[in-house]
């Protein structure tokens, strides 16, 4: 447990925080002393809402009707993934093992919490952000890979880089990648990964058995709830990062509408989250609005006015996220500060 705790606190500790200025640092220090931040009440309420809502929908799906229950379950399942992200960053408690306990149930089916945590913390090394080999969440590929790819592989990436293609294809590609890494762990006898996957499968079996006992088909859940929930999370990450020389300019500010902000727990203000990974979800909007101009200067105007903008721009056109262009001199020099 300690090793994992070290990893988590490493990302949430103050030393990784990049403040806009001293005024913001003072504001955050004040907020951190407030009752709201110390109690973490919003996150606890969210936890109760997500779990309560998810289990109530499965237990009461006949009362709700299959279609309404399915739509609600897609929402709660995607929301659970947003909650897991919050747990990774040290909320609602400072205890990594306890947070892990709160996020271990496989409500979203595909990923053990530990897999998400390890890859996500690697993604938070801002100086390596978007780099295909160092950032596990990057959609870029290395120039060498791109050269090697056959026509159909490039076509697949081109499709994945359209808005609807990303929603339909990216979850499947992620699932294949994750299952391959699981098989590799079993083949190579990686004890930690085997333990994690075994627990995940055990819990998943129990969860789906309970679901079947409620008369809801686990196959229906996997295809009609879990997959669309993953697709919803792909809306957020569609062009969340770009390969810019300056690490500060690699993360987007997306001025999304209220339902999206609630579902994604304000992660649409992504540049703010990458600067201040330890700040809880309910403060990100306030901190962005408090320093709006500064943030848009820092991230070099990487601003989107809502997710609809991506849908309109990239329904037919593909976004240019293929071979990574590499980082310029400035990024190499300033590398370790990110």
Please name every model-derived segment.
Residues 85-90, 120-124:
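Active-site recognition of the HExxH zinc-binding catalytic motif
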Residues 88-89, 127, 244, 264, ...:
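Short active-site segment of divalent metal-dependent hydrolases/proteases
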Residues 92-111, 133-149, 247-261:
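Juxtamembrane helix-capping/reentrant segments at transmembrane boundaries
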Residues 1-76, 106-122, 126-219, 223, ...:
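Non-catalytic, topology-defining segments of multipass membrane proteins
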Residues 67, 83-84, 97-102, 116-119:
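Generic hydrophobic, aliphatic-rich segments that mediate packing or membrane embedding
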Residues 81-89, 99-106, 270:
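Glycine-/proline-rich flexible loop or hinge segments
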Residues 74-87, 112, 116, 163-171, ...:
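Transmembrane alpha-helical segments that form the membrane-embedded catalytic/substrate-channel core
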């Amino acid at each position: 447990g300690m090793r994992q705790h070290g990893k988590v606190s490493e990302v949430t500790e103050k030393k990784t925080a990049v403040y806009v200025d001293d005024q913001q640092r003072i504001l955050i220090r004040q907020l951190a002393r407030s009752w709201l931040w110390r109690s973490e009440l919003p996150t606890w309420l969210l936890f109760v809402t997500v779990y309560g809502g998810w289990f109530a929908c499965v237990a009461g799906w006949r009362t709700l009707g299959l279609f309404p229950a399915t739509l609600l379950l897609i929402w709660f399942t995607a929301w659970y993934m947003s909650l897991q992200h919050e747990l990774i960053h040290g909320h609602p408690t400072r205890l990594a093992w306890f947070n892990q306990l709160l996020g271990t149930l496989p409500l979203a089916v595909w990923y053990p919490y530990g897999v998400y945590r390890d890859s996500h913390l690697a993604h938070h090394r801002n100086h390596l952000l978007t780099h295909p080999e160092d950032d596990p969440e990057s959609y870029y590929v290395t120039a060498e890979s791109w050269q090697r790819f056959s026509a159909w592989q490039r076509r697949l990436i081109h499709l994945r880089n359209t808005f609807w293609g990303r929603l339909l294809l990216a979850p499947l590609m992620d699932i294949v990648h994750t299952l391959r890494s699981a098989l590799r762990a079993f083949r190579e006898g990686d004890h930690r990964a085997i333990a994690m996957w075994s627990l995940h499968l055990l819990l998943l079996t129990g969860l789906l058995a309970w679901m079947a006992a409620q008369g809801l088909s686990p196959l229906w859940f996997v295809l009609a709830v879990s997959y669309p929930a993953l697709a919803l999370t792909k809306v957020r990450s569609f062009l969340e990062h770009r390969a810019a020389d300056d690490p500060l300019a690699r993360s987007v500010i997306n001025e999304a509408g209220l339902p999206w902000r609630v579902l994604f727990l304000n992660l649409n203000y992504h540049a703010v989250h990458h600067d201040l990974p330890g700040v809880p979800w309910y403060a990100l909007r306030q901190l962005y609005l408090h320093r709006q101009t500064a943030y848009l200067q820092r991230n070099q105007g990487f601003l989107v006015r809502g997710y609809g903008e991506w849908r309109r721009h990239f329904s037919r056109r593909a976004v240019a996220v293929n071979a990574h262009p590499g980082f310029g001199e400035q990024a190499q020099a300033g590398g370790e500060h990110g």
